[in-house]
Amino acid sequence: MVPESFLLELPKCEHHLHLEGTLEPDLLFPLAKRNNIQLPDHFPQTPEELAVRYTQFKDLQDFLDYYYIGTNVLLKEEDFFDLAWAYFTKVSKQGLVHAELFYDPQSHTTRGVSLETVTRGFERACKKAHEELGITSKLIMCLLRHLPPQDCLQTIEEAEQLIKSGVIHGLGLDSAEKPFPPSLFVECYERAAKINPELRLTAHAGEEGTHQFVSDALDLLNVTRIDHGVNSKQSEELMARLAEQQTLLTVCPLSNVKLQVVQSVKEIPLQLFLDKNIAFSLNSDDPAYFGGYILDNYYQVNKDFPDWDFKVWERIAKNGINGSWCEQKRKEELLAKVDAVVAKYTN
């Protein structure tokens, strides 16, 4: 094991974080009040009760049911700004230096909140985080795969200007995985890439779905990153391909345990991925719901993989930087920061 002080100081990049998934109970209830939103009768009545319910998810769908109720309290640009700013202030104390952030506009547009409102609120928080906290960030618009692909295509058309201008830096695919394979979204990804050939592409795959979902995301959607991807372990051929192409897997340890993908963090094939030279980063996914932000994930992995030394953690940090979608100059700055922290602890 390495000292937790080292992990705290180690510069971190987060690539798998849903902004709506950072909605803590102590922000959810004030926003509901501010916007006169009536929460469902079966919904817990206090932040404390809700926090307890968040410890009891049976699977991905059980979590999603609560996640989508939570999004109902977000209505105005200010709400989205407050949500993202609360995330940035938390992680600024955890060694986070760069974040690539998912958001789900369809959770909001289906309620009559415009895509522009959502995006501008988040974008303002990203700018403030850069100016005041020194954290760089990119926004990744996700399509909800449980909605009809035609609706997803419509969302891409609505986002055309934001994609063209680069405010939306990447496209992702999330929500319930198993019933909705990548093949349903080929047209969506092709259209988005046509609007802006520089748009970065990723997709959730291989969390509850098999390794075939990962291969299909690579082959059919032309993604250059895989979100989760833990079931890639099922195929030697796929693992060799991921290693050769240095495709980043954005792994979410505490999330995988919370949603019963694995029983413990030890079961996540992180050592296998290291042995196979597959690049991965460690991320928090939906931290308000899963009881852990990025540093909590680093601490838990450190406990469950006690043989990992400074060299291994240096490699993970650098893989995260090299796999990021920030500019080369920023990558070089961050790599130098990692070197400085490693040198401090190993010299």
UniProtKB/Swiss-Prot annotation:
Main location: cytoplasm
Cellular component terms per the entry's GO annotation: cytosol; nucleus
InterPro entries xref list: A/AMP_deam_AS, A_deaminase_dom, ADE, Ado/ade_deaminase, Metal_Hydrolase
HAMAP family named among the record's database cross-references: Adenine_deaminase
Binding site for Zn(2+): 16, 18, 204, 285
Annotated site, Important for catalytic activity, chain positions: 228
UniProt KW keywords: Cytoplasm, Hydrolase, Metal-binding, Nucleotide metabolism, Nucleus, Zinc
Chain's gene name: AAH1
Name of protein: Adenine deaminase
